[in-house]
Amino acid sequence: MDLSLLLTLAVIHAVALISPGPDFAIMVKIATQQSRSTAVAAAVGISIAILAHTILSLTGVSLLIKSSHTLYLLVQIVGASYLAWMGFDALRAGLAILAKRKMSARVHAGTNDDAVISAGDVEGVASVAGGLGGAMSRRQGFLTGLYTNLLNPKALVFFLTLFSALITPSVTTSTKIASAILLLSLSLAWFGFLAVMLSKAQVQLKLQRLTPVIDAVIGVIFMSVALAIYSNLLLTA
């Protein structure tokens, strides 16, 4: 077993894990707005997706996908579309929460402007905010984490590049298996840490007022990644 290779993989993957991106963003959103069990489920989902990318890269499947123009184009379009939808959804949720708070404040203040605010108006905005930022089940949390990483074309390219550079034909099967276990363990440790720490009641309470801001930032991150992928597709077309 090549310990120096495993150490190199660990360092590179650790840096990638803590870097801001879709995985980190979705963990912050879920952990600060959902239950701890849902946040942990999301952490497991992201980690399983990372394991899948690792296996696909080690077995050469990712290389086949990257080598096929049509297949890789499809992967990029689907992935970018998913990230764009997630970003739009986060932005819409943040705006809905802001609208709900403004309406509630005007109602409590007893404002009697020309525009009459009815209970139905408040409930309507509340239902939109609830539908977008409402409670998620553990299954929903797991699938959100899974799809966020698995459908991200940049993740596929990252792992393909990483293993293409470090895993040579001379590397033993035991080292390959150990590398997959190592990356899975590091992913579970990091995202599990975020899930536990950010889902604490004190943390969620402090960040509650910042929920629209968090949603907006996350929306921008997702849509920026999607835009970068779309732009690259147009430039290379």
Residue spans for each PLM region:
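Alpha-helical membrane-protein architecture signal
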Residues: L7, V11, A135-Y147, A178
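Hydrophobic/aromatic residues within the transmembrane alpha-helices of Major Facilitator Superfamily
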Residues: A14, I18, L51-A52, F88, ...
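Transmembrane alpha-helical segments of integral membrane proteins
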Residues: L56, L188-V203
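Membrane helix-loop-helix hairpins that form the core translocation module of multi-pass transporters
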Residues: L5, S37-Q140, L227
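Interfacial loop-to-transmembrane junctions
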Residues: V196-V220
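Juxtamembrane transmembrane-helix termini in multi-pass membrane transport proteins
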Residues: L3-L73, T161-I177, L182
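Juxtamembrane boundary at the C-terminal end of a transmembrane helix
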Residues: L227-A237
